[in-house]
A protein has these predicted regions:
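Helix-start (N-cap) detector for alpha-helical repeat units in TPR-like alpha-solenoids
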Residues: 59-60, 93-94, 138-142, 184-185, ...
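Structural marker of alpha-solenoid helical repeat scaffolds
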Residues: 88, 133, 179, 213-214, ...
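Register position in tetratricopeptide repeats
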Residues: 71, 105-106, 150-151, 196, ...
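Residue-level recognition of tetratricopeptide repeat
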Residues: 67, 101, 105-108, 146, ...
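Alpha-helical segment of the N-proximal tetratricopeptide repeat
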Residues: 57-88, 105-116, 185, 189, ...
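Canonical tetratricopeptide repeat
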Residues: 98, 143, 189, 223, ...
Length: 442
């Protein structure tokens, strides 16, 4: 038997009377929910469960990143960081000037004239943009002078353009010093310009002023090393390169320049140590740069250790297999080792270019694994003229009636005479090669 409370209906719903306060509360909740839903749909209200938006980076953070990468020796990464900073702050002349300086430094890590010129031209564009924004800033003017001076490279530009660039560099650095006579970088860059104007004694006085103003800049010691090199004071230059390295220990081009000075003094072990340090820095950064291996290869070749030289140039070719300059270096090593057949093949790739099969054979690559690489030959310039000369000499020496190579040799010699008619030493070498081919009726 079930107990049923009195008045409790069992088989129908009980209708309660409405509570006005309860109804008002529910309506308020519904209306509020509608507003929230609408806000979420239009983006006016953000859900607490949405991921937090990534904060926007400010230019200063990219500058700090660039400085850190520069100190680590990663010039490419530093340049990219400064470019990002400038994208956020395009009217900052100081950033553009610093980017111009980094871009100029990066040219020291390139091997062909075309690559170097392109890097320096880009640096010049950045310097020009900086000057437009701050025409009376001493540091911006100093960096413009530095960049213009590096662009005034006789191996890369005509004599007329070289003199014009030097003149503008001189004007910029003079103005920089007028604005701030204690600007150590301006004084150092002025000394560098004076060396390039063949005013070495004046350059020595100017770099002394830079050292007195502030010797904490890497560039002040770099330029002093350059001044000492121009005076053939290689021992003093080595000391200055070492000081520059103390201030910027991971810049590979400083280690390379130190090594070149050791090599000039035939201090080959010390030279190789400097070049090996550049290799080590690049490995730490994950950079595959052929330049230190070229320096090592040339050093071994000077010592007559051609096997070690060949091994290092092969490594360089692995890193940059389409670079014709590297085939020229390989040809020079084969030439010194009196391996004339291999020298001829390598020089052909450097001067005339070669197909994928020829480049693969020289690189000793695996055709089943390595990508095919064709090589475009170098034009005849100041930077490539010795490859042309040696190639012509090898062609003349290897001429046989059954395998005639003098026709190509004579083409090389004619091209050389047209391009460098006033280079007496080179023309004398050309004449010797022509004499060989003339005996065969060419």
């Amino acid at each position: 038997m079930y107990y049923v409370p009195e008045g409790k209906p069992l088989f129908r719903r009980q209708h309660r009377r409405s509570n006005p306060y309860r109804v008002f509360f529910l309506l308020t909740l519904i209306i509020g929910a509608l507003f929230v839903y609408r806000g979420l749909a239009t983006g006016e209200v953000v859900s607490p469960f949405e991921p937090t938006p990534t904060p926007t980076r400010v230019p200063a953070s990219f500058v700090l990143q660039g400085q850190t990468l520069f100190e680590a020796g990663d010039l490419t990464g530093a340049i990219a960081a400064y470019q990002q900073a400038i994208a956020l702050d395009p009217d900052n002349a100081s950033l553009l000037a610093e980017l111009a300086r980094l871009q100029a430094y990066s040219s020291t890590l390139l091997t062909t004239d075309a690559q170097v010129l392109a890097a320096l031209r880009q640096a010049k564009e950045y310097a020009d943009q900086a000057i437009e924004l701050a025409p009376d800033d001493s540091m911006v003017l100093a960096i413009k002078a530095f960049v213009y001076n590096w662009n005034a490279n006789g191996s890369l530009v005509s004599e007329e353009e070289r003199l014009a660039l030097l003149s503008e560099a001189e004007q910029a650095v003079t103005r920089a010093i007028d604005l701030d006579s204690r600007n150590a970088l301006a004084l150092a860059y002025s000394a560098e310009i004076l060396v390039d104007q063949q005013q070495v004694l004046d350059a020595e006085d100017r770099i002394r002023l830079a050292l007195e103003a502030d010797d904490s800049y890497m560039d002040v010691h770099r330029v002093n090393a350059y001044v000492q090199e121009s005076l053939a004071n290689y021992g003093e230059a080595i000391v200055e390169w070492q000081k520059a390295i103390e201030l910027a220990p991971n810049l590979t081009f400083l280690h390379l320049r130190l090594g070149y000075n050791y090599r000039s003094l035939q201090m080959y072990d010390q030279a190789l140590e400097s070049f090996a340090r550049a290799v080590e820095i690049n490995k730490q950064l994950g950079i595959q740069d052929p330049v230190p291996y070229i320096a090592i290869a040339k050093t071994y070749a000077q010592q007559g250790e051609f096997f070690a030289a060949s091994w290092n140039i092969q490594t360089a070719l692995e890193y940059d297999p389409a670079n014709p300059d590297l085939y020229g270096v390989a040809g020079d090593i084969f030439y010194r080792a009196r391996n004339y057949e291999s020298a001829m093949e390598a020089f052909h790739c450097a001067v005339r270019g070669c197909d994928a099969d020829a480049s693969c054979e020289l690189r000793q690559c695996d055709q089943e694994v390595d990508l095919p690489v064709t090589v475009e030959g170098l034009p005849l310039t100041e930077g490539s003229k010795w490859y042309y000369l040696e190639y012509g000499q090898v062609l003349a020496a290897l001429h046989r009636n059954a395998s005639p190579t003098c026709p190509e040799a004579m083409d090389i010699f004619r091209e050389f005479r047209r391009t460098f008619p006033d280079d007496e030493l080179a023309i004398s070498i050309v004449s010797a090669g022509e004499a060989i081919c003339e005996r065969f009726g060419y």
